[in-house]
Amino acid sequence: MNNSGSGGSSPFVESPDLVSDGHLHTERKDTPIDVDNWKYKYDNLLNQYEIEKVRWQKEQYDSEKSHEALHLQLEKARNEIDQLVESKRFLEAQLQSQHPQNTQKEWSHEDNKVNNNSMNNDYMLLEEKYKSDVFHLDNSVNELKLELTSCRSLLKKYEEVIEQQSEQIKEIKKTLKKKEQELDEIEVNRLKQAHNATNTEEIRQQTNENASFSNGYNTLMSMKNSVNYWKNENQQLNQKLSEYSDIYQQLQEAQLEIMELKANLEEWNKFLSNKKQQDNSNDYSIDHFIIEFESQRRELNMVTEELAEVKKSYYNSKILNDELALERNQLLKLKDDYENNIINLEKLNHELEQQKVLLEEECSLLKNQIPTKENLNQQIRSTNRNDAEYDSLLDNYKQETENLTNELKRLNDSLIEQNRNQGTEMKKRKLRNGDHININYSQRLNELQQNNLSLEKDNEKLRLVVEKLEGKLDDLRKTKPKNIRILQQRDSPLLKLQFVRRKENELLREENQNLLTMIENITENRNESFDKIPLTSYNSLKYQYEISMDTNKKQEKKFSRLKQIFNKKSLEFIDVVNSLLGFKLEFQQDGRVKIYSCYMPNKYLIANLVDNTLKSNLDTVISDWDSLLNDWVVEKGQLPCFLASLTLQLWKMENDS
């Protein structure tokens, strides 16, 4: 069933036959494959090295982290043991210092002993527990240290292996460069040989052309000499004409100036005659006009100066008005602030008075309680000898209550005085400010005018500098050399991969910082439980999920594209088979192929490629079906010939019908 004929076609593109051009062609064919293989090996080794390096760095970081955590736990356990020892010593010292003075204290002492024994037992249990924990932690630390040493040794081995492989790769690159240079030299020699063969024929043609060119050259030289002579004559004539044209232009300009001067003289004469008629005097001349003009110009300058002074005074008064308005607003704000402060102080005073009343009531209650306490003290004196301490405590308490009442009175007095002083100071400030405002404003106006002039000068200087720099910039832009631009794909896979790695690195750093802070919080708050996950770990997982979704989408697009290409090519293949062989193929499940004839589409053949069986409904149409099947398929094993004979018979039947 294989279509091995020379006239058959396939749906896939066949590779063209390579014409052997000797040793040179074979070298050209083999070297790119070797280069690609070596590059592929080099990339694989680099990737393996980076993966192993990252893995070992991660393991080292995890081991160091766990070692630090264990070390912290050890220190905490030791600190707790020290605290328990100190508390035990403190309790023992208290027990030794306290002696029983009556039967009740003896009972309490016995209770304390019982409690102390229970605490000692608890302490012993805790000590044993912490010792066992310390032993386990030491063992785990030693195991981690051994793992660290083994990991470092393995890392060194991997680094040595990678260095050796990198040296081998460098040597391979050198050999590749040498081979490429040899290939370039061979190509240059081949091109030179081909070029030399064509040069001999070109030299012959050029000798013939040179002879014809020499004859033409002589004729051209004679013509050139005559042309140069006439050119010189023409230039001399043109120079004379240009001189005449310049003189003619000067003459026209002089005539125009004379006409303008005449018109000006006529205007002056008219003006002088009009002036003489107005003044009724024959002595009026141009000198009189100049004197009048200068006097009017002086008057105009005086008026402009007066106007400038008026403008300046108006501007100064406007500035004064604005500043006074600002001062007024500030004073109003200060007034509001002081009023708010007074209200707040009154509230404070009211609260303090309430506190004073409460304290006085407390003092009265305490004074009422003093006689009852004195009776109690007398009873205690009969039983205990330490009555002097209680008396001193009562005296101190009385003194403190008296001091508190005195402080409350003093605070109220000071608040009242502050309110009064603030009111008087506000009035004094307003009076002082009102007297000195005009002087301060005049001084400030002069200073501001001087500053304004200096700033305007600086502004002009800077503007000139900016104009110069802008001119230089324009010159530089005009004379800017063309830069060499390196083309790069906008959406290249390398840029995408770098962007993804950079984003993953940033997310991992943030996650690492958050986890470290979380570990510190857990170590500080040992009793609290932390059931939350940091947001950065969720963000990193989300980013990885988005990347995986993007890759899935790309793979799905690629798969759908390949599926479309496959369907298109398979349809082309079926159409080609139908047009060339006269059969339409339909591939079914379980390795079955259904074959329809183009001459009788309702009849078919089913070939099972797994069981090597053949079924058909053509036996009702073709009379000698069994004989053809036995002859071609069973005896000779030629299924293509059997199908060809079927097509011939079906074609005859179609023509006969």
Curated annotation (Swiss-Prot):
Pfam families xref list: MAD (PF05557)
Location in or out of the cell: Nucleus
Bias-annotated ranges (Polar residues): 96-105
Regions annotated as coiled coil: 46-99, 136-533
UniProt keyword NAD, yes or no: no
Compositionally biased tracts (Basic and acidic residues): 20-29
Major site of localization recorded for this protein: nucleus
Annotated InterPro entries: Mad1
CC terms in the record's Gene Ontology section: kinetochore; mitotic spindle; nuclear envelope
Keywords: Cell cycle, Cell division, Coiled coil, Mitosis, Nucleus
Cell division as UniProt keyword: yes
Region (Disordered) residue spans: 1-29, 96-116
BP terms from Gene Ontology: activation of mitotic cell cycle spindle assembly checkpoint; attachment of mitotic spindle microtubules to kinetochore; cell division; mitotic DNA integrity checkpoint signaling; mitotic spindle assembly checkpoint signaling; negative regulation of protein import into nucleus during spindle assembly checkpoint; nucleocytoplasmic transport
Function: Central component of the spindle assembly checkpoint.
PANTHER family in UniProt: MITOTIC SPINDLE ASSEMBLY CHECKPOINT PROTEIN MAD1, MITOTIC SPINDLE ASSEMBLY CHECKPOINT PROTEIN MAD1 MITOTIC ARREST DEFICIENT-LIKE PROTEIN 1
Entry similarity comment: Belongs to the MAD1 family.
Protein name (record): Spindle assembly checkpoint component MAD1
